[in-house]
Design a protein with these regions (language model features):
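Short glycine/proline-centered loop/turn elements that form peptide/ligand docking sites
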Residues: 5-6, 15, 78-79, 123-130
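Conserved ATP-binding/catalytic motifs of P-loop helicase motor domains
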Residues: 71-74, 148
Length: 156
């Protein structure tokens, strides 16, 4: 996953926009965030499908189908606290025995720092870091080849 743009949408993004991001990130989910990147909710491809079947148009806002209380974890949690909150029964409740639950890991400001997948046994099977896009880069002379390559990577 290149950056958080593939896993987050604003509440006003359209259902079509959300489906496009879900198609790219292949998690089956996007997370709804406010203007400060704080988590507001989550939308799965199933939420969108059910919304369309209920008569929603793909041009409607994603907030109309978003779940406002998704399962989350915090980066400050240790393994014991994680295991107390993300139990196999919680995972199975959301995705059954054979599925994986995609969970945003939040910082203390409720911003997504990574996304993990947990299986029906409650075991973490993958983690993807969420890299914030760079808004400003200050380059001071003498960066050399390596510095210029790093800047290109940051700005790319």
């Amino acid at each position: 996953m290149e950056n958080d743009a593939e896993v987050t949408v604003s509440p006003e993004a359209t259902l079509k926009d959300a489906m496009g991001k879900i198609n790219v990130n292949r998690f089956g989910i996007v997370f709804v965030v406010d203007e400060d990147d704080r988590l507001l909710g989550a939308v799965t491809d199933g939420d969108i499908r059910r919304g369309i079947l209920d008569g929603k148009k793909v041009t409607e806002a994603v907030r109309t189908v978003a779940t406002t209380d998704p399962v989350t974890a915090y980066e400050s949690w240790g393994e014991q606290k994680f295991n107390q909150h993300i139990t196999p029964s919680i995972v199975r409740h959301h995705v059954g025995h054979d599925g994986t639950l995609t969970i945003p890991v939040l910082n203390d400001d409720d911003q997504i720092v990574s996304v993990i997948n947990v299986d029906g046994k409650g075991e973490q099977v993958s983690e993807q870091m969420v890299r914030k896009s760079v808004e400003t880069v200050l380059v001071i002379g003498g960066a050399g080849y390596l510095g210029s390559q790093l800047c290109r990577e940051l700005l790319g």
